[in-house]
Every structure is written in C-alpha cells, then in structure tokens.
UniProtKB/Swiss-Prot annotation:
UniProt-recorded name of the protein: SHC SH2 domain-binding protein 1 homolog B
Signal peptide coordinates: none
GO annotations of cellular component type: cytoplasm; midbody; spindle
Per-repeat ranges for PbH1: 480-502, 503-524, 532-554
Gene transcribed to yield this protein: shcbp1-b
The entry's keywords: Cytoplasm, Cytoskeleton, Repeat
Length: 698
C-alpha cells in the first residue's frame, strides 16, 4: 500500500496539467468567438478591414522616383469589401444631409490621428509628409514636410521653399483624399490606409455635389450608394457597352458643369440688393429656372443608367451601335476600295495576295487599295460596295464591329488562320445592318462576354465557312432580318447557339451547331401574331448540346385565351392544325424519305416471315435498321410538323381578331399568298441532352 501512495500526487499533477491546458483552450476559444461572433457593442472594432481575421494590405512600389518609400496597395478592393464598409461602418442608414457627419464619426474611430507618413499627391507634384493631427469634421490632415525632403514635380518650378509656402497658406492642412499612406510592416497603419481609401473612393466615384439637396426622407445607401457602386464595378469589369459608358461619363461632366453654374447664379442672387437690381434679378431667375430644369433632366438620365433594369430597357438599345451610326452609302468620289488588313506583310504574302485576290478584283487598274492593321478600322473606313480582305493572323478588337453598308469581309485563308478576338464584356461583337453583308473564312472568338457574337438587325447577312466561338448567345436574327449561313461551325454558347425572332428569315445549310445550351431557339411571340420566322434547315449537324437541338418558344393556350376573350374554341385549334395541315397549300418538308424507310422495313419484315426464319431475330434486325435510318428523318419531321401547325394556329388567331373588328380576309386555306416556306430536311440531331426538339410555353 505504501508503494501505491505516490501515484496520487502524480494524478494531481496530471489534473493540474489538464486544467492549465483546458484554461488555455478556453481563452483561445473565447478569442475565436470574439472575432466570429462580436457583440453589437464590439461591431465597430475592426471597421471592415478584417484585420483581426488575418488580412493584411500588400505593398505597392511607386513608378517614377525610386527614392519614395513603398505605399499600401488599396486601389484593388473587391465590390463586397467596399459594400460592407459603406453599409455597416461608414454610412449605415444615414440620410443625405447626414453623410458628412457619419463619415466624420467613422474616421474618428478608425483613423490613427498622428505618427504616420504619407505621400501628398496632387496633379502638379508628389511630396513626402508626416501627419501630426487629423481634423475629422473637415476631412483634413495637419502635416509637415519630412526630412530629407522628397518631391517629384511635374513642373520645373517646384522647390522646398515653394511647398513650405503652400503649406503655410493652407495652415498646414491637406485633404485626406490627397494622401497615400506609406507602407509599414508593423501593421499599425493598415486600417488607416484602408480608411482613407474608402473615403477617397467615396468622394471620387459615389458622391455627387447635388446629393445634399435631395429629399431627406430616404436611406442614402440604398438609394444612391449601392446602385452607383454596382455601376462602377460593372464598368470596371466591362459589363456595359463602351458607348453607354462614354455617355454616362459625359452626362456626369455636364451635370457637374450645370450644377456649378446654377450654384454660382444662386449665390449671386442671394448677395444682390433686390431693390436696385430687380430687373436683372428677374432675368437671372428665368435663367436659373432653365438651369434647374436642365439639371433635373440630366439627373433623370443618370438614374436610368444607374438602375440595372432601366439601363437594359432604355439605354442598351441606344448604344448597340445601330442607333448611333448611319449608312454612308456610295463613296462621294465613286468607285470601290479594297481594304487589306494585316499586322505585317511579307513580300511572298503580298505576291500571293496580289495574284489570287487583288488582280481578279482589279479589272480597273486605278482601283484604290488601302492597308490597315485593325479589322475594326477597316470596316469603319468602308463605303457601299467595298471589300475587306483580312490576312492570316490574330486580331484583337475592343469595340463593336458595326456594319451599316453593303460590304464583303473575307478572310484570306482558312478560318482558323484568320482570327478576330473580342476584348471587353459589355459591347456586342458584330452588328449587321447593311442591305447585303457577306462574311467568309473568318473565325470570331469571344471571351467573358455578356452580349451575343453576331446580331443581324436588318438586311441580309451571309456567313460562309466561318467559325464562331461564342460565350453567351451565338447568332441572333432580329425581326425583318435575313440570314444565310453556310458551312460554318458555331459552338460554346451558354444560351442558344442561334436565336430566330418573328418576322425573320433564316437559311441554314451544312452547318455544325454544338456544345451550346440549346442549338436553335425559335421565338414565336403572340404579340407579333402574323409574322412568323421563315426557316430553311438542310444538312446541318446539331449535336452535343446541353438541352434540345431546336426549341420553339410559343404562348401557352391559357395565355391565348386570356389575351382574347372571344376565342372560346382555342383549345381545339392545336388538335385541328395537324389534321388540316395535309390539305393546306403550305409547302411541306420532304418527308417521303422517312415513309419510304418505313415501307422498306415492313417489306423486309414480310419477306422474313415468308421465309419462316426466326421471328425474334427478324424483328430485331428490322427495328435496328429502321431506327438507324429514321433517326434524323424523324427529328426533321417533328420540327417541320410543329412549325407548320404553329403557322396555321397563328393565322387563325389573326383572322379571328380581325373578324371582331369587322375586317374580312381571304380564305383560311389560302396560305400560299403569305409566302410561308418551311423546309427542314437532311439534318442530323445527335447526342443532345433533351432530344431533337422541344417546346417552351410561356
């Protein structure tokens, strides 16, 4: 028993050991909880910097004078970082009149008042200073020049004495927005650098001089800060057309100029003696009212661009290119010009180009040839009837190729050798508006785009032997436009490879459409009752799409009933359409091949029965051969049948609506006068996720 007694002290030591470790774990757990689950009273301790979670600001080396110290890199913050800071720490639910007060409180809690160095950055010079104090209410810092004196001037007259004199005039006060905090490895001034960046960004990108005069009953962050912040990052990430961005910046400059004039006029009126200058005041009042109306109009336009939905509805179409440009027509001096595009031209290339393309085109020896380095520049220089020849190479463009005149764009070589790559997410790639446009032997490549690759707004466009590497939507054929697409390859669209609108005409021959969300999307809206897409599809291969090879978008029967109360027999229309289509005068697709295959299969089956062979084996052979031969023909038949039935349905709906207005039309079966033509033959539909054809009802 005596030998066992020492075990108890050992156990006591182990208890102390576990108790100490347990206390240490509790302290660490408490620290984690304090970071992850802060109380409301502690919620302002980090002010959006995430410093306590281990985030540190990187340093950046200034370009230019290498004597300057490194700075904190704060200009590459993400959207959510700025969003959270403005919402949770800086502005909260303040009103427009309370913005400066809230920012001053934020600075007082988050900013180190002294002891840090910064570069005072202006348009004229950069100079190293030390901050001795901060006036939070006026957003100014009290500074002094550092020793040794470091200055980088953009003019030759800046000296140590001139900077000292300037500081004396300004009472040593410098706006916080003009300070860039010098990098410090200790981490003490990370929060200071980040705070100044948030204030600087707010006054440069978010705040407007007229915000204080807005109604004071709404949440400033919700009404102004959030949409402006989102718009800034949409512009930064190229999600908005460049034309709309230019318009937005122009509107901002106009608004600031008009507001400054209006403010000056208002101040002058308030300082005048109303008795001695009454007549002048009346003129100024009228001028002020005009400025006020102009300012309100500019603010309305800015709000349209700021709101994502209104921006899409009212602004995108005006900046798509077709609304901003007009066709040039024939060249004033007459004649045709050949535009040759090449980044570099060797003698061999020039000889081959001259022999194979230029000489056959140049029946007139005086025909002008212009050379360009950019396809966009060449297209913009074109007049009616010009030819653009693009030599092999990779061409990167940053704007919209807007084709307004009847021109021809031809790649000299194979499509994989003539590549046009689009940079910028917001702009469309190619817009076709010319009466007759032809593009051949060119590969178009999109990266991270939000618009389609080619849009035909009007006229006739021919795509021959082209490759289209899409990002969102592929080719869009708008109302009253016509597309002839031959022997081309289209792939990669996250939406539909092709969108065909009502009233358009689309001819597809020998193309490949693959690896898209859907192959072809045919839009048949009830609003455009009598204008249906006219489609010819022959010998295309539509394969490996995520959804359907072909999708028809049409209104549901319930929608049709609600849109026209007198259509009580609407539910019988779809059933009668297919039954009546055989007796109509509409040109039907060539379905005899499918019926012939079926007849052959039946004959072979009968022949096998007569020979009294194994009935199981005979049945399997017949079904297998029939399935292989009819796979493509069945898909063509289903699509054509549905389109023809939909044509008759819309025709009867249109006539029924006209009859309610007392308008008498031709006989229902006389559809040939409408020139309806649907030909869908010889197409192959393979490995599409949902099948060859689908219908989407809305």
């Amino acid at each position: 028993m005596a030998e066992e007694e020492p075990l108890f002290p050992a156990l006591q030591e182990e208890d102390d050991f576990f108790r100490i470790n347990s206390d240490r774990c509790s302290e660490e757990l408490q620290d984690v909880k304090q970071v992850l689950f802060q109380e409301e009273g502690d919620s302002g301790s980090d002010y959006g910097s995430f410093k306590r979670l281990g985030k540190v600001l990187p340093r950046t080396v200034r370009a230019g004078n290498m004597l300057f110290p490194d700075l904190f890199q704060t200009n590459n913050l993400l959207f959510y970082e700025r969003f959270e800071t403005y919402k949770d720490y800086m502005l909260g639910d303040c009103k427009p009149s309370e913005v400066k007060e809230f920012i001053a409180e934020y600075l007082e809690k988050a900013l180190e008042p002294s002891g840090w160095k910064a570069i005072w950055h202006t348009d004229v010079f950069d100079v190293l200073v030390e901050v001795t104090d901060v006036e939070f209410s006026s957003l100014n810092a009290i500074v002094r020049l550092c020793e040794p004196f470091l200055c980088e001037s953009r003019v030759s007259s800046i000296t140590h004495e001139s900077i000292n004199d300037l500081l004396e005039v300004k009472d040593q006060r410098v706006p916080l927005q003009e300070l860039r905090v010098v990098f410090d490895e200790s981490g003490l001034y990370d929060q200071t650098a980040l705070t100044i960046e948030h204030v600087r960004f707010f006054y440069q990108q978010i705040w407007r001089p007229w915000d204080e005069e807005e109604e004071d009953y709404f949440d400033y962050f919700v009404r102004c800060v959030e949409p402006r912040l989102r718009l800034h990052y949409d512009i930064l990430e190229d999600r908005i057309p460049s034309g709309l961005v230019a318009e937005y910046r122009s509107l901002l400059l106009q608004s600031e100029a008009v507001y400054m004039q209006f403010t000056n006029l208002r101040n002058n009126l308030s300082n005048k003696d109303s008795d001695s200058e009454a007549e002048l005041d009346n003129v100024s009042m009228v001028e002020g009212m005009k400025m006020d109306d102009e300012m309100e109009n500019l603010k309305r336009k800015l709000k349209l661009i700021k709101n994502p939905l209104l921006r899409y509805l009212f602004c995108y179409q005006r900046n798509s290119g077709s609304y901003n440009m007009q066709a040039k027509g024939p060249r004033p001096t007459g004649g045709k010009v050949i535009h040759v595009v090449s980044t570099s031209m060797s003698i061999t290339m020039l000889q081959c180009l001259t022999r194979e393309r230029l000489q056959p085109e140049c029946s007139n020896k005086d025909l002008e040839i212009q050379f360009h380095r950019d396809p966009l520049e060449a297209v913009n220089a074109c007049y009616e009837g010009d030819l653009v020849i693009i030599c092999p190479g990779l061409y990167t463009i940053y704007g919209l190729i807007n084709i307004m005149d009847s021109i021809e764009i031809e790649g000299y070589g194979l499509p994989d050798d003539v590549i046009i790559e689009k940079k910028g997410k917001g702009d469309s790639f190619v817009d076709c508006n010319g009466a007759h446009v032809k593009i051949s032997n060119v590969k178009f490549v999109q990266h991270e785009a939000v618009e389609g690759i080619i849009t035909i707004h009007s006229g006739t466009t021919e795509l021959d032997n082209c490759v289209l590497q899409c990002e969102t939507t592929g080719v869009t054929v708008k109302k009253c436009a016509e597309l002839l697409m031959k022997y081309s390859d289209l792939y990669g669209a996250k939406g539909a490879g092709m969108e065909i609108y009502p009233g358009s005409k689309c001819t597809l021959i020998g193309n490949g459409i693959h690896h898209c969300r859907d192959g072809i999307l045919i839009k048949d809206f009830i609003d455009v009752v009598y204008e249906i897409p006219k489609i010819i599809m022959e010998n295309n291969v539509i394969h490996n799409n995520e959804g359907y090879a072909v999708v028809l978008v049409k209104p549901s029967p319930n929608f049709e009933k609600n849109s026209h109360t007198e259509e009580l027999e609407g539910e019988h229309l779809d059933n009668n359409m297919i039954e009546e289509q055989a007796s109509s005068n509409v040109l039907q697709p060539n379905l005899n091949e499918a019926m012939g295959v079926e007849d052959n299969a039946i004959e072979k089956s009968d022949h096998l029965e007569e020979e009294k062979s194994d009935p199981t084996i005979a049945k399997e052979e017949v079904e297998c051969e029939y399935a292989i031969d009819c796979e493509e023909a069945e898909g063509n038949q289903v699509i054509a049948t549905e389109l023809v039935a939909n044509t008759r349905r819309k025709t009867q709906l249109h006539k029924k609506r006209l009859s309610t207005l007392g308008i008498v039309t031709a006989d229902d079966n006389n559809l040939t006068s409408q020139e309806i033509f649907v030909s869908i033959v010889g197409n192959q539909f393979k490995r599409n996720g949902k099948g060859s054809f689908g219908t989407f009802l809305f």
